[in-house]
């Protein structure tokens, strides 16, 4: 919605397209390391439609910044990305994320059906993944990094399973780092008796967790994740998952990535994945 050449105007307070929409920045939370979060109020100037409709018509797919080929102008790639950069189980009529949960791109309809036939149940949650997931750590210390926040919803059926399942008999597998962060956020809120978490039913909350060694993780037992960018907060999360409560996960992750490079594994969104048991 905000082309590169209009970002300066957006930062100053207003931007838009004549006859289509006007937008006003009504609040912003800037980071000392650059960037920040903006709360924007939109006014649609067309007879019909809302912000999502306008974005679908004039916007371009928000691919990760490390995919550097021409995106808006290359219609062949654009059509391919719209199909590939989306999980088969996504709620396509509810586009709330700015990025795909890329670990889920490895699952096909056929694979999911095979898992069901083997008695492996699948449970949904909705992730409002933000562009902050691509923000590298720029602070001199891990603790100094301003962690981005992401909204999530856990349906009642999924919540029930997270609460009653016993890891030793039915391990909980998180598909991707954002799923893991949502599950861990829910687990910590529940353990702390967070009043924002209802006693029963679905859960809607915002995960602002920054998980790094030597923290512990109790929200999931197994995870599948892609190979990520250097200086990513996702690397901190994965190293914690590898060795909860210990610093050894840092060295272990380095060894895993060295092995991946030696075997020419593909990295990032369209790359390979690893299963952590």
Task: Give the predicted meaning of each segment.
Residues 1-277:
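Surface-exposed, charge/polar-rich loops and edge strands
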């Amino acid at each position: 919605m905000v082309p590169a050449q209009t970002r300066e105007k957006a930062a100053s307070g207003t931007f838009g397209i004549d006859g289509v929409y006007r937008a006003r920045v009504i609040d912003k939370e800037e980071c000392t390391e650059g960037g920040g979060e903006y709360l924007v109020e939109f006014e649609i100037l067309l007879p019909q439609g809302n912000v999502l409709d306008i974005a679908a018509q004039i916007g371009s797919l928000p691919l990760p910044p490390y995919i550097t080929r021409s995106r808006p102008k290359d219609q062949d790639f654009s059509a391919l990305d719209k199909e590939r950069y989306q999980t088969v189980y996504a709620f396509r009529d509810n586009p709330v994320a700015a990025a795909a949960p890329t670990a889920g791109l490895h699952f096909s309809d056929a694979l999911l059906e095979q898992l069901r036939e083997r008695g492996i149940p699948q449970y949904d949650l909705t992730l409002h993944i933000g562009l902050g997931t691509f923000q590298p750590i720029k602070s001199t210390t891990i603790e100094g990094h301003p962690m981005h926040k992401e909204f999530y919803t856990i349906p009642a059926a999924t919540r029930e399973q997270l609460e009653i399942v016993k890891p030793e008999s039915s391990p909980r597998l998180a598909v991707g780092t954002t799923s893991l962060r949502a599950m861990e956020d829910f687990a910590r809120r529940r353990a702390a008796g967070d009043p924002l978490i209802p006693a029963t039913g679905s859960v809607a909350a915002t995960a602002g967790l920054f998980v790094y060694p030597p923290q512990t993780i109790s929200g999931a037992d197994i995870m599948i994740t892609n190979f990520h960018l250097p200086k990513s907060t996702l690397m901190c999360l994965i190293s914690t998952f590898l060795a909860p409560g210990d610093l050894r996960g840092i060295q272990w992750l380095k060894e895993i990535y060295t092995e991946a490079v030696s075997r020419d594994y593909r990295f990032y969104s369209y790359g390979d994945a690893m299963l952590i048991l």
